[in-house]
Each structure stands twice: as C-alpha cells, then as structure tokens.
Amino acid sequence: CVLLGLLRLDDVPCLQWNYGKDILLMNRFLIEHHPDAIAKSLCDQHIVKMPLEEAQMLCTSLWHHAPHYARECDLYKPVHQKHPCPLWAMETRANFGYAYDLYCSMLCEYHHRYGKWHGAGKHSWAISRGIKLIPEGDMTPHPQCFSGHDDCKTDEDWPIVAYRAFYTLDKSSFARYNKGRDKPQWMQGDG
C-alpha cells in the first residue's frame, strides 16, 4: 500500500522489522504474524475503529517520552496510559515500530475496504518521525488483554493462538466481512 505522506517503516532499510515466526504481535489483536495479515483478518467493524485506537496508543507513547514533540505536532492527547497495550508500545523502539507498522497496515486496509482514507492517518507522518524518540530495545512479549476471558490466555510470548481464540469467542457474534475480505479460515474452525 502506498500512503500519500505516510512513511512505512518497511521502506526504510535501517528500520525494517523481522515479522517471521519469532516476532508476533483498548486492544491490539495479534491474530496473525505480520501487520498486513492482521489488518486483512480484522472484521469490517474493527478495521473502522482500530486505526484510531492504534494512533492513540502511539501518540500516548510519544507524549510519555517526548511531550515537547507531541505538543509541537498537536498529537492526540494521551489515553489509557496504564493499559498494557500502550505501555507495551512505549517500552521499546522495536515495539513502537511494530505498532506503527500495524497502524499503517490498518490505514491501508481501511482504504482497500472503504475507498477512502481514515481520519486517524492525519498523525502518521509525525508518529513515524517520532520513533527516534522512543528508547531503543528489542521486541518484548506482548500482553494478553482478554477482559472476562482469562481461559483464552496462553504462555506464548507472542500470543497469536490466544488472540485467535479470544477473537473467535468474543467477536464472532458480530464480526462481518462484507467489504472485500473473507472471514479468516481459523475463525471458521478450519485452521
């Protein structure tokens, strides 16, 4: 996906992330390994709301580490500052980079499904420039945020199996795939 005015971290060799089997992924649904695959697997309702949530989490990270920069760029105000997902994004530059790539992937997927750009993309350039303000570090285990569904939790560092179980159990009753994507195989019980 080519985003006007957006910098995809995949386009910058020194900032590329390894999305192989060793690196997986208010919530961040780690239902696939790669951010593009996650975005394609989200239901229509989530591809509408999740880009804003991810933008808010990324902006919260920048407010935490560089309030002067966040203020200068007029980023979204900090939200849910003690929630595990924003805390994970602000912990290391690698975490932030993964969350940023997921944000860009969701913006592209929204455009694919709805034929227009999501309003949450307005901060993408400032967020991409702000990555250097996040502390360096490798990816860390992602928290499992399943309110009321602790039975879905696993001992995975990158809880794809857990998030798929949660997404299927908690979201399949309302999840629609009418905008150019099919329901993922794993949600149909075939994988």
Walk through the language-model features, giving the residues of each:
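Extreme N-terminal basic, low-complexity initiation segments
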Residues: 1-13
